């Protein structure tokens, strides 16, 4: 049983999905089969356990292609090979060498278009939308380099229209919530839709059963309502109070250890956090305190969030704060928000 199941058995209130409902994130194959069954728009796909069969399928299709390890892989289980050789290498890793454990691989078509994150509070068939955000997955500026857990984010996302959001609600988030109920594993908690606006409409890239990181750091500061009331309504299955959002917009930069998402060193001192302006929010992702001083202790170390009346102002404030933080082993992307600035 998962932690939510254990709490419920003990008669305790808890916000979050059951272990069964969390399968929507824990298994890519489960999520894809669910979408196929309930006609939720997503990339065409096929699931394989056999290396030869997967390789043959990739050979017949077009490159680039998307390869997803079926289970949880700490955000590293998705590969987008640009050549057939790279695809072969990745399939060997996943299916022959069991790099992430024994499992299956979902092979899906490569979609193009801007991605955005649509998080919703869900209680069975009731779906309450949060404001949109956009993450920046690649390690380096210009969207270059390997995929990471996310190097920055902003909210809202002007390039996504109200029509896009309505479509995502009516054709994706609500139907998926209803599908989970129909499948006997109703979802409660935060359902995160990783969506893409393709030339043929909004489609699902992935689902997570939790708040997204780094998106949450730019979304929740914009929440005007008391989050406790929201959690309570979902946990108790009672009507949700109206969820209100601030007009101020947000943008945040992640400061990561040099070498991330590969191997990196830890233990570098971070200076200047006590000198930042009042209206800058700093989220500690991978820091430790030793003798009253902050040190790096993870891959993604800090996220620095700025506020503004528009995204340019939020960007400039956050970037100025980032540039004033001193540490010998951190890097960051200066181009967070490039699609909208």
Residue spans for each PLM region:
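General beta-strand structural signal in soluble alpha/beta enzymes
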Residues: 14-17, 44-47, 65-69, 80, ...
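Short, charged, surface-exposed secondary-structure boundary motifs
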Residues: 23-29, 140-142
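Conserved anion/nucleotide-ligand pocket segment
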Residues: 62-84, 219
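Generic C-terminus detector
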Residues: 287-291, 296-341
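Internal nucleotide-binding/catalytic subdomain
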Residues: 77-216
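Active-site "cap" helix and flanking loop/linker of ATP-utilizing ligase/carboxylase catalytic domains
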Residues: 169-191, 208-279, 290
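A short, GP-enriched loop/loop-strand-helix hinge that lies immediately N-terminal to
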Residues: 1-26, 40-49
């Amino acid at each position: 049983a998962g932690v939510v199941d254990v709490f419920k058995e003990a008669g305790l209130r808890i916000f979050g999905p059951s272990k069964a409902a969390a399968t929507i994130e824990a298994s890519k194959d489960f999520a894809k089969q669910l979408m196929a069954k309930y006609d939720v728009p997503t990339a065409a796909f096929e699931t394989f356990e056999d290396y030869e069969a997967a390789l043959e399928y990739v050979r017949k299709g077009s490159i680039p292609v998307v390869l997803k390890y079926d289970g949880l892989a700490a955000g590293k289980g998705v590969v987008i090979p640009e050549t057939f050789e790279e695809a072969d290498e990745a399939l060997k890793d996943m299916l022959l060498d069991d790099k992430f454990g024994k499992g299956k691989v979902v092979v899906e078509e490569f979609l193009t278009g801007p991605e955005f994150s649509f998080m919703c509070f869900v209680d069975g068939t009731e779906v309450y939308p949060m404001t949109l955000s956009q993450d920046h997955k690649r390690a380096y500026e210009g969207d270059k380099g390997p995929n990471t857990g996310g190097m920055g984010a902003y909210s809202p996302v002007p390039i996504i229209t109200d029509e896009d959001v309505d479509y995502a609600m009516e054709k994706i988030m609500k139907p998926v919530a209803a599908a989970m109920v129909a499948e006997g594993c109703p979802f409660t908690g935060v359902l995160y839709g990783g969506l893409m606006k393709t030339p043929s409409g909004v489609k699902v890239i992935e689902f997570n059963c939790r708040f997204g990181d780094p998106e949450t750091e730019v979304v929740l500061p914009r929440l005007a309502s008391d989050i406790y009331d929201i959690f309570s309504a979902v946990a108790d299955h009672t009507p949700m109070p109206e969820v209100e959002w601030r007009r101020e917009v947000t943008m945040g930069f992640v400061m990561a250890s040099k070498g991330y998402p590969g191997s990196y060193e830890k233990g570098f001192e971070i200076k200047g956090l006590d000198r930042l302006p009042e209206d800058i929010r700093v989220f500690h992702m991978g820091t430790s305190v030793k003798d009253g001083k902050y040190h790096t202790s993870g891959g993604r170390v800090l996220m620095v969030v700025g506020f503004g009346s528009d995204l340019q102002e939020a960007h400039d404030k956050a970037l100025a704060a980032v540039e004033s933080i001193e540490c010998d082993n951190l890097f960051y992307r200066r181009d967070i928000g490039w699609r909208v600035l």
